Amino acid sequence: YQLGEKNGTLVAGGNGEGNGLNQLNFPAYLFVDRQQNVYVSDNNNHRVMKWNKGAKEGFVVAGGQGQGNALTQLYCPNGIFVDTLGTLYVADGGNNRVMRWTQRDKKQGTVIVGGNVRGEGANQLSYPAGLSFDREGNLYVGDQNNHRVQRFSIE
């Protein structure tokens, strides 16, 4: 990608709304890693996609098994974060949880926050949206429908 370029460069999707590997349906949040690979929470396809730099199509790195709450599924994924080990964190909005996908287990994720019924308790979320980490590894979650941001200490 060129510094100072005035025109946008297509890096993901751009082939109309759909669920093909070269399409997106309501791309919500993005994460770009150090290699300039682009991760996209493909909200209405209930998946997270990864486009390697220069690729014409992406591949599914989480979800993509239809809307649902199984460990292989997402329901309107929002905020995403990828750490230096390639571990993917997803704010799974419709399921009121945050999930983690490791490089070792790409088939299903692990619930690390929430996953209980939607609510206002300290261990509950209501449509989590954005997420981020601090230098100490604490997870911050924008708990959208509860109008709050929560911090979690995770392993």
Predicted ranges, named:
Residues 32-35, 82-85, 133-136:
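Residue-level detector of Asp-centered blade-edge/turn motifs that repeat once per structural unit
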Residues 38-39, 88-89, 139-140:
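Conserved beta-propeller blade signature
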Residues 8, 46-48, 96-98, 147-149:
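Structural signal for beta-propeller blades
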Residues 4-28, 54-78, 105-129:
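Gly/Pro-rich loop segments of beta-rich domains
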Residues 71-105:
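Loop/turn-rich, solvent-exposed surfaces of beta-rich toroidal or solenoidal domains
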Residues 126-155:
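Blade-level signature of beta-propeller repeat domains, shared across WD40, Kelch, NHL, RCC1
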Residues 3, 35, 43, 53, ...:
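Short loop/turn segments immediately following the C-termini of beta-strands
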